[in-house]
Amino acid sequence: MENIKSIFYFLLAGVFEIGGGYLIWLWLRQGKSLIYGIIGALVLILYGIIPTLQPENSNFGRVYATYGGIFIVLSILCGWKVDNIIPDKFDLIGGFIALIGVLIIMYAPRG
């Protein structure tokens, strides 16, 4: 159960980081109102808090390394759904390798 909560927090952090960053992108690059930037900044603050919800035995380095791999996969998916850029075989292979790597980093049994 703890691993499921942990994965949920990684996914939630990804949604908040990508969502907050996208709102700021819309404000600065596409001329949306300042409210987009403000909401984006608040969402990014929440993104910074979410990783602290990982299990007590987690350490900063492993949590952020793992999140980096999750972010890679979520970014590929976001590019596909938001920007209509279909992932090619190299995107998929790279995302898969990153995902396997972070699962080992975060969840491999340690003595």
Curated annotation (Swiss-Prot):
Report the membrane topology from the UniProt record. Answer: Multi-pass membrane protein
Instruction: List where the protein spans the membrane.
Output: 7-27, 33-53, 60-80, 85-105
Major place of residence: membrane
Q: Which GO terms describe its cellular component?
A: plasma membrane
Q: Where in the cell is it found?
A: Cell membrane
Tell me the superkingdom of the source: Bacteria
Coiled-coil regions listed in the entry? none
List keywords of the entry alphabetically. Cell membrane, Membrane, Transmembrane, Transmembrane helix
* UniProt-listed SUPFAM superfamilies: Multidrug resistance efflux transporter EmrE
Q: Which PANTHER family match?
A: UPF0060 MEMBRANE PROTEIN YNFA
Query: What protein family does this chain belong to?
Result: Belongs to the UPF0060 family.
- State the name under which the record lists this protein: UPF0060 membrane protein CPR_1507
Q: Which organism is it from?
A: Clostridium perfringens (strain SM101 / Type A)
